[in-house]
Each structure stands twice: as C-alpha cells, then as structure tokens.
Design a protein with these regions (language model features):
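Conserved N-terminal catalytic/coupling substructures associated with nucleotide/phosphate chemistry
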Residues: 1-157
Length: 157
C-alpha cells in the first residue's frame, strides 16, 4: 500500500484511481468505456484496467467488503452485457488482487480490481450501452465522433 508498482501504463495496461465514496459506482462509471476501447483497437493484445493504482503508479487499493465484492462482480457483468454487438463472457475477466502493507501482510478488504480484456474480432465497432464508441490510446481512451468512426472504418479497409 502506497508503494509504487514497477510496471508502467501503456496501450495494454491502464491505471485507474478510485475517487469518491462509492468504489463500485466509480468503477462502473467507466468499465464499459475501457472494455469497448480495448475491443475496438485492431491489435492482438490483452488489455488490463487496474483500479486501485494511480497514474503515478502508487498502489492505493480499492476498499471492498465481502458483500461489495459480490455486488461489484455482478454489476460489472451486467454493465458489460449492454455492450453492442454483444460479447461472450469469455472475452473479459474480473479479478480482485490482494493489497499488502509494507510488512507484506494482507490489508483486509483492500484490493486492486483488475478487468482483463482478451482480443475479440468483429467487423463492427463495439459501443457502450449509451451507444458511445471508444478507442484505446497510449494515454487512456478516446471517444470517437461519427466522422472519426467513418475514417477509422475506411482505414481498416
């Protein structure tokens, strides 16, 4: 906790610090956007979104009690089921990674929430339940405007 991870953010790994009182709402507010962004890049990479690590690589963790962990998994699956076109559940996974203190003792109810997105081929762009289309970039994600979608489709030939 409060130590820095050795790996860095890049196109296949995104760090997210949970802000606000409600950890679940914070994660749910962007999880579908990042999953869609990974699905829409035409690279054969596995993407990871890690909630509980800040942009400066500091491990902050996400506080989740037992009932919240179950609710988080259920709510993320529900949110991702709204992606269009639909994706199989094997395309993503949700893991809770324990966080340790400086003495290497597990901190109770503190986790890194890791959502892993596997490559999935489609001739279409994926969109969120709000019909928003995103692309993953080195610095995060970018919401595409209608003309950008057309340009991107044309470039993919």
């Amino acid at each position: 906790m409060n130590s820095k991870v050795e790996f860095e953010e890049n196109i296949d790994m995104e760090f997210k610090e949970v802000k606000g009182i409600n950890s679940i709402d914070s994660i749910l507010s962007t999880v579908d956007q990042y999953v869609v962004a990974y699905l829409n890049i035409k690279r054969n990479i596995i993407g990871k979104i890690l909630w509980g690590i800040s942009d400066d690589r500091t491990v902050t963790g996400v506080r989740l009690e037992y009932s919240e962990r179950d609710k988080l998994r259920r709510d993320v699956v529900n949110k991702l089921s709204q992606i269009s076109p639909p994706i199989p559940s094997q395309v993503y996974s949700i893991s809770l990674v324990e966080v340790y203190d400086e003495n290497m003792k597990v901190i109770e109810d503190k986790y890194i929430v890791e959502v892993t997105v596997h490559p999935y081929s489609s001739e279409y762009f994926f969109s969120t339940g709000k019909d928003e289309v995103y692309l993953k970039t080195d610095g995060g994600k970018r919401k595409l405007k209608t003309h950008e979608i057309q340009i991107e489709l044309k470039s993919r030939g």
